[in-house]
Amino acid sequence: MNTFEKALKTLEELFSRDYQFALATSKDNIPSVRFVDTFYDDVRFYIVTYAKSQKTIEVESNCNVSLCNKLYRFNGKAYNIGHPVKEENKEIRSKLIKVFEPWYFEHNNEDDENMCYIKVELDNGFFYKDGTGYKVNFASKKAEEFPFDFDIVMIE
């Protein structure tokens, strides 16, 4: 397994679950950040949201976004991929319902035509696990691996 493949495996181990990130978008060169629940699948993060939300409106005018939490950071392109019941969303919908099961239907109304999914296709990122850091360029399928320990004291 090469370093890029190892990095992808680590990404899956870390984020193929309900994981909260701060999502940064921007409009008219003014940044906006909010926490969102995400799910990682196949070099993409998915977010369940609403088409009229500020984040979705900003993504539609500028697809460049960042995700960050606990020194994990990613840059990518975000797209509104439409309503959950669209045929092309069938596979990811079943995964999102499963991973977000405790709250998916309680907080979302699939009868609302404005419910949607945002897909974040990753350009680059930094993450770590078990003393190893990874700096990854997803477009070129290149990754660096190095010793890394999260030694920051978190303050609530």
Residue ranges of model-derived segments:
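Extreme N-terminal tail/first-helix region
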Residues: 1-21, 145-148
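A short, Trp-centered hydrophobic/proline-enriched beta-strand micro-motif
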Residues: 13-28, 64-68
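Short beta-strand-initiation
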Residues: 18, 31-34, 62, 112-115
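Hydrophobic residues embedded in beta-strands of well-ordered beta-sheets
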Residues: 31, 45-46, 125
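Well-ordered beta-strand positions
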Residues: 37-39, 119
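A short mixed-secondary-structure module that forms the rim of ligand-binding clefts
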Residues: 39-73
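Charged, gly/pro-rich active-site loop segments
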Residues: 73, 77-156
